[in-house]
Every structure is written in structure tokens, then in C-alpha cells.
């Protein structure tokens, strides 16, 4: 029976490499997957899942208005699995649509993304995935400063921590740092 999975982690935890690994494993067995990502993530180009170690794959870009259930349901061949990168950028309707893909089409859905933002607040997509997912798994990484488990992210501008501002700002290593709770409140910057 298909399930909805949410695999979350901070920046640099290997979420994108994990999704690419899962896609490879399915496809190596001749089982096609549907790879999707948010159209908001433009770092490697719209509709591209890319890892920091250089691996990448083309994906269907999910925009704000897209009916993901209708899209998956209209495919001529049902995928063996739907894989979503940058799932934190999904909206409530997208998450409910993916739950329908699982429940009505019997297709497993694995969503990968951040849980909380630099203000330590849940992203909309993450909030609804935490509510609806059948299985939730943390992808772990270590604090930039002390090597404890990182559970939060600091946004930096010109090397200084920022705790206020717009939630959505697409960046990479130069903008976001994975940290433990202690170093979130007292970073060694």
C-alpha cells in the first residue's frame, strides 16, 4: 500500500543527493519515477534537482497554481513513485493533492525538504506534510560550529546572522548555515 513520506533536514544534510539516489535505484530496476521540484528554486535552473556534489536531474517544476493530482492522474503511465525536492515550498493544496495521489492512485510519494526556516518557523509545505505524512524521517547533519546535530538554519548577510525578513530567499552555502539550537541563539560569527 502506498504511503506519503516526508524526509526533512537542515541545509547541507544531503536531501537532494538522497532524492537522486532514490530515483536512480528505482530507474535502475526499470521502474520509472516522477521527479518534481518547486519552481521557486532557481539555483540550478527551474525544473532541476541538483546536489552540492554535482549530481543533477531534470524534474517537473511545480508552480503555485499547479494541480499536482491532475498532473499525475493525466500521465499515460503511472509512475512507480513520485519524488519531490524542495517540498517546503509546496502550498497546502499541493500537499493535500499529493495525499490524494497516495490514497486514490496508490502511488507512493516521497517529499524532501526543510522543516523550518531561518526564523525557526515552519514552512507552509512542511507544516502540512508533518500533518499528513504517513512516515516522517529526519535526514541528519552536523552543526557548522560544534558538530552536534544541526536542527536549525541561520541566514547570514555579509557574514552576520539575520533573524528577520522574508521567508523565501533562495540561497546556498553563502547564505544559510546549519546549526544546533545553542549556536542558533549564539552563533560564533
From Swiss-Prot:
Transmembrane segments: none
GO CC annotation terms, alphabetical: cytosol
Reactions catalysed: thymidine + ATP = dTMP + ADP + H(+)
InterPro entries: P-loop_NTPase (IPR027417), Thymidine_kinase (IPR001267), Thymidine_kinase_CS (IPR020633)
Main EC class the enzyme belongs to: transferase
Keywords: ATP-binding, Cytoplasm, DNA synthesis, Kinase, Metal-binding, Nucleotide-binding, Transferase, Zinc
Record flagged with keyword Secreted: no
Residue numbers binding Zn(2+): 143, 146, 180, 183
Record-listed E.C. numbers: 2.7.1.21
Biological processes per GO annotation: DNA biosynthetic process; thymidine metabolic process
Signal peptide: none
Main subcellular localisation: cytoplasm
Binding positions (ATP): 9-16, 85-88
Compartments (UniProt record): Cytoplasm
Active site positions: 86 (proton acceptor)
Gene3D superfamilies, alphabetized: 3.30.60.20, P-loop containing nucleotide triphosphate hydrolases
Entry GO MF terms: ATP binding; thymidine kinase activity; zinc ion binding
Family: Belongs to the thymidine kinase family.
Assembly information from the UniProt record: Homotetramer.
Listed HAMAP family: Thymidine_kinase
Protein name (record): Thymidine kinase
Native source organism of the sequence: Lactococcus lactis subsp. lactis (strain IL1403) (Streptococcus lactis)
Gene: tdk
Amino acid at each position: 500500500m502506498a504511503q506519503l513520506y516526508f524526509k526533512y533536514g537542515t541545509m547541507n544534510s544531503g536531501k537532494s543527493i538522497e532524492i537522486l539516489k532514490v530515483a536512480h535505484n528505482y530507474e535502475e530496476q526499470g521502474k520509472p519515477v516522477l521527479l518534481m521540484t518547486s519552481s521557486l528554486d532557481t539555483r540550478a535552473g527551474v525544473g532541476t534537482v541538483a546536489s552540492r556534489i554535482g549530481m543533477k536531474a531534470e524534474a517537473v517544476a511545480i508552480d503555485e497554481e499547479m494541480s499536482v493530482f491532475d498532473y499525475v492522474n493525466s500521465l499515460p503511465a503511472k509512475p512507480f513513485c513520485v519524488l519531490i525536492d524542495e517540498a517546503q515550498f509546496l502550498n497546502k493544496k499541493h500537499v493535500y493533492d499529493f495525499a490524494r495521489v497516495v490514497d486514490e492512485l496508490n502511488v507512493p510519494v516521497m517529499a524532501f525538504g526543510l522543516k523550518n526556516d531561518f526564523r525557526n518557523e515552519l514552512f507552509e509545505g512542511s507544516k502540512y506534510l508533518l500533518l499528513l505524512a504517513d512516515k516522517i524521517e529526519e535526514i541528519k547533519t552536523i552543526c557548522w560550529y560544534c558538530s552536534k546535530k544541526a536542527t536549525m538554519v541561520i541566514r547570514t548577510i555579509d557574514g552576520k546572522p539575520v533573524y528577520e525578513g522574508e521567508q523565501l530567499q533562495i540561497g546556498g552555502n553563502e547564505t544559510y548555515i546549519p546549526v544546533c539550537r545553542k549556536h542558533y541563539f549564539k552563533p560564533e560569527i
